[in-house]
Amino acid sequence: MSKNYLNQRNKVEDFLFKSKFDYENQPINRLKKVEIIENKQELLKKLKLKIENLEDCELKNNANKIVFSDGNKDSSVMIIGEGPGQKEDELGKPFVGDAGILLNKMLAAINLDRKDIYITNVVNYRPPSNRKPETKEIKRYSEYLYEHVEIINPKMIILLGS
């Protein structure tokens, strides 16, 4: 017999009762996200610094300010826009131009206040001439966006833009 064959029951027993589930004489930490919750502000600062320190970034070279985020970092709702426009680039906050006025009206229509929502963009610098972010730009910023979502850990994500 060159191979041991395990039936389904043996697989379950191996999975449930082998050494990886042996417990030591100490409590089990089931709250793995506590560290993230406690340090959310610090993690957001580090993420923003990472984005600000990007090198060889055409978007960064053409923009005035980083447009990182706005709103409640503890919100269960996160809005992700496509990219900042001219007004956002001037003020360094997402959705403060015409799109922001429309967003505020839409939120009010469903009894939500902007200050209770967390808002960011796919790319954090304004594309030249208010054009849509290109695929390569979106890919470059996607790792930062994933990290951003992980830090905020919303229950709902609303995507805006084209």
Task: For each feature predicted by the language model, list its residue ranges.
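Non-catalytic accessory regions outside enzyme or core folds
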Residues: M1-F21
